[in-house]
């Protein structure tokens, strides 16, 4: 009797397996991991114009800074990605691209994300900040930012475009003048 129940269980299991696998198909190939970006070039261009630095005192982390220089090359790739992400019409995309290029002519902009372990140290946008930001060119000429703005409310949206932005980092837009103050020559290139 026990042997009969075992055969019956095997038969029921096989019948159920055949019944439920009738609509299944074999996977012929896997698709590569889904890239979160809509355009082919954005990630490589973003990586080319972005850097990260860390400051440690012994084993203690004092600062993480991630920044992207918003060059003309970056702005074109960003505008393409933005247009795809937000499904802009061709006219809207052209306007966004024009706005990006115009902003690039106002000065050298960087998007900067920072992490500091003490919230009181997160004062990059204050005039009396403990931090001093300077843009230094190949000739050693230095300029201070003409604008530094904390972008508090835009973090969730911006993390798609700047993957180093996390909930633990503060995000700033930093604009430097395009020309040196002493020689009035272009600061970069």
Model-derived regions: residue spans:
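Bacterial N-terminal signal peptides that target proteins for export
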Residues: 2-11
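Sec-dependent N-terminal signal peptides
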Residues: 11-18
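C-terminal motif of bacterial Sec signal peptides marking the signal peptidase cleavage site
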Residues: 20-23
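Conserved functional micro-motifs across diverse proteins
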Residues: 25-189
């Amino acid at each position: 009797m026990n042997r009969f129940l075992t055969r019956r269980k095997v038969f029921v299991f096989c019948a159920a397996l055949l019944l439920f696998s009738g609509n299944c198909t074999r996977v012929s190939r896997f698709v590569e991991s889904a890239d979160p970006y809509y355009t082919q070039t954005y990630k490589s261009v973003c990586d080319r114009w972005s850097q990260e630095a860390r400051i440690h005192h012994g084993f203690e982390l004092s600062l993480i800074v991630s920044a992207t220089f918003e060059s003309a090359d970056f702005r074109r790739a960003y505008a393409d990605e933005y247009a795809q992400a937000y499904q802009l019409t061709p006219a809207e995309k052209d306007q966004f691209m024009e706005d990006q290029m115009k902003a690039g002519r106002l000065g050298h902009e960087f998007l900067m994300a920072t992490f500091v372990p003490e919230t009181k140290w997160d004062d990059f946008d204050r005039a009396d900040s403990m931090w001093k930001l300077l843009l230094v060119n190949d000739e050693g000429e230095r300029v201070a930012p003409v604008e530094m703005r904390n972008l508090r409310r835009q973090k969730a949206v911006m993390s798609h475009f700047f993957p180093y932005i996390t909930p633990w980092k503060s995000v700033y837009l930093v604009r430097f003048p395009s020309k040196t103050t002493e020689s009035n020559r272009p600061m970069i290139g």
